[in-house]
Amino acid sequence: MVELRQFSDLPIALSGISRIADPSPPPPVVAIRRRFKGGGNTRRIVFSVPLIFAFPFPTGTPKDVLVGIAAVFDGHSGSEASEMASQLLLDYFALHIYFLLDATFSKELTGKLPNSLMHLYDLDSQRFQDSLPLNFHLDILKEALLRAIYDIDATFTKEASTRKLDSGSTATIALIADGQLLVASIGDSKALLCSERYETPEEAKATLIKLYRERKRNQDSSPSRFSDLKLEHRTGLMRFIAKELTKDHHPDREDEMLRVKAAGGYVTKWAGVPRVNGQLAVSRSIGDLTYRSYGVISAPEVMDWQPLVANDSYLVVSSDGIFEKLEVQDACDRLWEVKNQTSFGAGVPSYCSISLADCLVNTAFEKGSMDNMAAVVVPLKSNLDWESQPKEQSVGPSGFKMKNTYALPCEFLSSQPNLFRMG
């Protein structure tokens, strides 16, 4: 039996169960934010949801594993693909975890588990638990996510074929569990880490000069303030360094272009952007049925589980519009400025005091980005004790247990009213 606990203030439909959490407000500390700009006939949908799943461990008792999910779906040629993907992800992900665990213990396999688990099937229940590898739950989470993505695309493909839909969507999904991070991406939405790194006085000086010049262009700093900064950081500087976790699936990428050409498609630029058959700007997507016969695929590229370390400070998941005018390092520089606003507050725009995601979206907007934009910023250094928070339980006919709590503070802002509630 798999136990699913839901942290949020949003209704989630799971195998016929619809559960709305207690309406009392979450704690005042906000850990996750996201923000939208832009309009048109496409939708940039983001969400971040913490869940708890109970997994079997060698101790013989289930262990609660907190799983954070942050996702961005950036639609194009219509909103149908991004809407469906966001609606189905949590349900499909949870159900595949249930199916994989149930298949493992019942031995009534309806599919294949990861190869690393196959040799465990012939063991009895106790020996099975004793033989579980330490990363058993991570294997299950990864496989469930990949199967969920596959099923989302299959479901939308059927719907699009029936309704003659042309829309498509990117998908960038990050999982955090047991201090490790996994990212699956389709298209050109990005995920990146901002991690602290010590800079020598010489490196720090170069950083401060760069920031000072940037602020001077924006008329939000003064020479006297820069002198103060040099004194404050004359012994060195802790700075955020960006690490990109995804690779854009653009058709001019060598491996992507080879696949497109092998399928009979071609890549050419239109308005300065490489496109499949002169039209589609990504070489992987959910939907986009017209281009499937020309090498456009929905298979995600996966950054497998990697440990988060003490200096990893923020995870950013965003649509590509954020980086139309910004580099990934610019995003981490802005977050670093906000974090150090005791020293740098004079140069941090007022909108950065609202939320970190607002800060990135509005920074990109002021830099001249013309695209729709969406972002999720997840602080990675929160020490909240979720076990100490009050919980309530509801058991549905499917056997799923869903527990709701505000142990991890989240604020949901979404353009999708049937999945998320503004408040």
Curated annotation (Swiss-Prot):
This is Putative protein phosphatase 2C 50. InterPro entries: PP2C (IPR015655), PPM-type-like_dom_sf (IPR036457), PPM-type_phosphatase-like_dom (IPR001932). Its cofactor is Mg(2+); Mn(2+). It comes from Arabidopsis thaliana (Mouse-ear cress). Binds 2 magnesium or manganese ions per subunit. Keywords: Hydrolase, Magnesium, Manganese, Metal-binding, Protein phosphatase. Coiled coil: none annotated. Gene3D superfamilies: PPM-type phosphatase domain. Belongs to the PP2C family. Mn(2+) 2 binds at residues 74, 320, 371. Pfam families: PP2C. It catalyses: O-phospho-L-seryl-[protein] + H2O = L-seryl-[protein] + phosphate; O-phospho-L-threonyl-[protein] + H2O = L-threonyl-[protein] + phosphate. Mn(2+) 1 binds at residues 74-75. Its EC number is 3.1.3.16. GO terms for molecular function: metal ion binding; protein serine/threonine phosphatase activity. Residues 52-380 form the PPM-type phosphatase domain.
